Each structure stands twice: as structure tokens, then as C-alpha cells.
Amino acid sequence: MKLPSSSATDLHKANIEHMVSMKDFSVREMDNMMELMSYLKQARKDNAVPQLFKGKSVGMIFEAGSTRTRVSFEVAATLLGGHALFLSPKDIHLGGKESIDDTSRVLSRMCDVIMARTNSPETLDGLLNMSTVPVINGLDTRFHPTQMLADLFTIREHITDGRQLNELTLAFMGDATDVCRSLMLTCAKYGMGFKQIGPVKYHMEPEWVELAESFCKESGGHIEITDDVERISDCDVVYGDSFY
């Protein structure tokens, strides 16, 4: 794979591409991202990680606590030659003494990328509206795109019988969280089968199911929302979560 040098990577481009939800990406784009992930995973094993982020900084806003997302972003930025800044609400004036719009403007001038884990979609939308650099959604109560990419990558690595993702059915055992919503939409884009299995009161909202089904019409996937636990029997992947 031919990779650009950091000096050739212009993050401050005119047409900024954010990562808000995997539903915004095509299957080809998601495949390309996973190909890069595979390359970088092997490069780390070989102690030869390319310095794609050399001289760059990512400002990480965390309204909510995190273990995996925070650590993975910090480690990734360091391995790629860059720097990650952890910014909690007590560290910056996020919507307090300073508007979210102003925070976004200021961070855009100083950082090359903004990553945000927010307690509301409105906070993320405010950052997106005024940012002049790419914004990555680290979870905003609606979507969790980086988790979805990691999950698909893991599934693909563990299905070793030659089947493609669009030949698989995934069962999600849990309530209608951002993870469930993101999984359903991502599976639908890929043409995978998706089943949410659990008590009716925890089922996904109809408007999101309708959106996923619209993706399935193009991809060939299928969606099932059920309280029948026996429906797990013909699934290839089981994803466990909690019922709150």
C-alpha cells in the first residue's frame, strides 16, 4: 500500500470530511479504512509504524468518561508521530463561559483534528458547524462510528472460512443504545443481516429501523427486531450488551 508522507497530508483542506456516523460512508470507503487498519496493525507488530500524523495534534474533548476510546486515540496519535490533548469540561470553557461555536473555532486554529465524546448531539453538532478541521465523533448518544469500524474489523478477522461480511448475520443482545443503532445501520449498509433481540420495551425506535431498511433495499441486507431469543440460532456473530 502506498501511503502519503505527513508533509503531503493537508488536513486543513477546503472540503472537510468529518466522521459522524458510519451511515455516511460507502462500503468501499469502509473497506478502504479497514485495509489501512490492517496495514497499521501489522506495521505495529513489525515496529515500523509510518509517521502519518507527524507534527499534528488531535484535541480530544471528553464530556463523558472513557477507557478504550481515550487510550486508543492517545496511543494511536503517539504511534503515528503526533500528539493528543485530553480536554475535559473542567479544563476548557465548553458551552460555559465560552460558546461551543467559539470553542470549535479556537481548537480548529490550534489542532489538526478534533475528536469529541459528548453527552448530547447538540454539542457535537455545534463543534461540526464551526470547525475548520475534521471532527471525529467518539460517541454522542446517537452514533459511535469508531467503535463500529473496530467491530467490523474484528469480525472480518475472525471469520476465516472465506465468507464476506455481506454473507453474515449479527445478533445484538441489548437495548436501543448508540451502539445498537450504529451496528444496525452499518450492517444494513454492508448488506449483512442484523437482529436486535430483547424485551419489547428495549427495541430500537421505528424511525431508525426504517432508515436501516432503506439501506437494505440497496445492499440486500435484512433487519429483524424481536423478543424471541431462539432467533439467535442462525446468527454468525453475537454482540452482547446490557439492558438499562
Q: Residues of each region from the PLM?
A:
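Short glycine-/small-residue-rich Rossmann-like dinucleotide-binding loops
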Residues: 38, 63, 119, 242-244
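Glycine-rich phosphate/diphosphate-binding loop of Rossmann-like nucleotide-binding domains
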Residues: 63-76, 157-241
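Residue-level preference for short coil/turn positions at secondary-structure junctions
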Residues: 15, 53-54, 131, 166, ...
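A short acidic, often aromatic-flanked loop/helix-cap motif at beta-alpha or helix-coil junctions
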Residues: 27, 141-145, 229-234
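Positively charged, low-complexity intrinsically disordered leader regions
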Residues: 1-71, 75
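Conserved beta-strand segments of alpha/beta enzyme cores
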Residues: 18, 83, 134, 193, ...
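Generic structural signal for well-ordered alpha-helical scaffold segments
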Residues: 38-42, 152-160, 184
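Phosphate/diphosphate ligand-binding glycine-rich loop within oxidoreductases
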Residues: 45-156
